[in-house]
């Protein structure tokens, strides 16, 4: 009698046969992607099919990171690499996928990797070649398609954050045949534009690997490298990397992110201006303190010098007077002993000589002291005049800077769309955030939002009256 197998035995035998067979361990299968599902556990489930056949596939989360940049969608032709597995409880054969390639992209990936190595060796990615974006941007050039969500999101982001920025659009074909030529020409056109652009955003929204390929072409990369305007590469989504991201001066994850990079909010600018003003004011005050201290030290040094010099001269004069007196007295005594008869005559002569010498020395001392005092007074007068002029100049600068800052602050405040709310006005919008300017935009019993200076209200239209009623 033939052996009868249980279902368990049959399935175990099939599992051993399928999973141990070498031909099913490392295989490549091409087909159309279908039923793509990203499970919250991190695993990915899908099918690959053709006209009359299909097989269920899974990719565990440990390998899921490999396909983040592929932007997979149902209907794509893909090539899966992995092995066959057999699940005993349901008797199902599945394809456990370890890696996925989009059909036809394999050759493009090889070109990408080879081109990356060549450009890296040539120094095209050197950080020292990167140009910096001005701190305050006024004129922005954008090279992208003139339709689609990317351009509208980018413009909306820039104008929301800083309405003063001027935007100049250079519409370009961003995918398909000859797209790289159009992008290259638009970069050159922007560099020769009649208005000096502060920064240039080159990019597009998301797409497949082939859709983004124009930004890997050498013509585009050479134009980016040669641009005298700083360039931000903003291609696709966060996981997407193209060669223009490496050659450009800055890479933005998305076009919207590029808009945030080039536009500072009004609040940021006001805070930065206040910071600059305080730093400048502190610097000037420190300079004034330094010069005042220097002046005081100079005055002290000059006073000490005069006092010391005067004391020295006085001691010199006193010693000279003492020496002369002793010499004269000895001379007189000698003459008295020898010439007693001429005592009165010689005594008068000596007194005359002493008076003459004392007078001469006194005149010398007075003249020398007066000369020093006059010189010092002149120096101090000139120094005080210089300091007075310097203080006046500094005060003028501070007044000018304060006036300029107040003027700029008033301009910024006038641009604040919420400023009128402080005067009792309000902003009315529907639930889709569209501003209500006329009764024609509303219906009875429709809910509206009213924005006040300190709160938001939700109201319902109960009655409509025009101003004429």
Swiss-Prot record:
Keywords: Cytoplasm, Exonuclease, Hydrolase, Nuclease. It is an enzyme of class 3 (hydrolase). The keyword tRNA processing does not apply. GO terms for cellular component: cytoplasm; exodeoxyribonuclease VII complex. It holds the Pfam family Exonuc_VII_L. Heterooligomer composed of large and small subunits. This is Exodeoxyribonuclease 7 large subunit. It comes from Mycoplasma mycoides subsp. mycoides SC (strain CCUG 32753 / NCTC 10114 / PG1). The lineage of its organism: Bacteria, Bacillati, Mycoplasmatota, Mollicutes, Mycoplasmataceae.
